[in-house]
């Protein structure tokens, strides 16, 4: 309960700060002029669109690939696959975004590819861990009941691994929200346009006008995904977690 109070208070503070800065007409005439509400809302929408598109692609790649490397015929690929994704995230986000520009050109596609690379590891790693850590006795029991490999995956493994997979998606989403600030450097849209305008013009309030809603967006999406994670967790797993 206390954690939720802290999150809501922080979110209210960030939103209040954003509203206050955006409604300022001037601070020292000719020195500071905030971005208009229309610019702020359009940038927020573009930022959210980039994050959601990158996450959908990262999920479509990371979850199946994480499951695939748990299978007997593909376990030898675990180290190179997880290791490759780890290398992708260990490289600074600015470097990845800069690399995409000469490869794919400036524009939306370069930003999306960079965000997918940077957000893939948590989803891939948690998908692998969620499936790999399931008690083999459960899988054997399902196989003994005559279930096929596909049925075991859909009806047994995925429901049990879902909380771990959702945790990876939540972490990836929060990372992507922050990384998307830099997408403006390769022609992407989003709140990074406001933040970097403040950086280049040395206006702290303009930086806050872009950074505060970005932080609020990360907190909001993280909270929503955490609630979805709890809702999708099987009741038996919740009871087991409370007893442990």
Give the ranges of each region predicted by the language model:
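N-terminal, non-cleaved signal-anchor transmembrane helix
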Residues: 1-56, 230-244
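Loop-to-helix entry region at the N-terminal start of transmembrane alpha-helices
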Residues: 42-54, 101-122, 162, 206, ...
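Hydrophobic transmembrane alpha-helices
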Residues: 60, 84-90, 100-103, 113-127, ...
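Membrane-embedded alpha-helices of multi-pass transport/permease systems
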Residues: 61-67, 110-139, 162, 169-177, ...
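Cytoplasmic-entry segments and transmembrane alpha-helices of multi-pass inner-membrane transporters
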Residues: 65-100, 125-133
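Transmembrane alpha-helices
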Residues: 117, 149-183, 209, 213-214, ...
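Short helix-to-coil transition segments within interhelical loops
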Residues: 131-137, 141-161, 187-189, 200
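Hydrophobic alpha-helical transmembrane segments of polytopic membrane proteins
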Residues: 191-232
């Amino acid at each position: 309960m206390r954690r939720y109070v802290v999150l809501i208070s922080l979110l209210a503070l960030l939103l209040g700060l954003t509203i206050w800065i955006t409604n300022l007409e001037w601070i020292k005439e000719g020195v500071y002029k905030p971005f208009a509400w229309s610019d702020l809302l359009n940038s927020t929408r573009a930022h959210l669109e980039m994050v959601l598109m990158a996450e959908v692609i990262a999920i479509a790649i990371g979850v199946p690939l994480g499951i695939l490397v748990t299978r007997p015929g593909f376990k030898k690929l675990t180290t190179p696959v997880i290791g490759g994704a780890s290398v992708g995230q260990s490289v600074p986000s600015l470097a990845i975004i800069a690399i995409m520009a000469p490869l794919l050109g400036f524009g939306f596609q370069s930003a999306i590819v960079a965000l997918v690379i940077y957000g893939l590891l948590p989803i891939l790693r948690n998908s692998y861990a969620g499936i790999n850590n399931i008690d083999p006795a459960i899988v054997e029991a399902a196989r003994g009941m005559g279930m096929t490999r596909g049925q075991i995956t859909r009806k047994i493994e995925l429901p049990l691994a879902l909380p771990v997979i959702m945790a990876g998606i939540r972490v990836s989403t929060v990372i992507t929200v922050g990384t998307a600030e830099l997408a403006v450097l390769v022609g992407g849209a989003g709140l990074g346009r406001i933040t970097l305008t403040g950086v280049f013009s040395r206006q702290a309030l303009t930086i806050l006008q872009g950074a505060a809603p970005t932080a609020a967006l990360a907190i909001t999406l993280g909270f929503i995904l955490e609630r979805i994670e709890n809702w999708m967790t099987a009741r038996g797993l919740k009871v087991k977690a409370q007893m442990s």
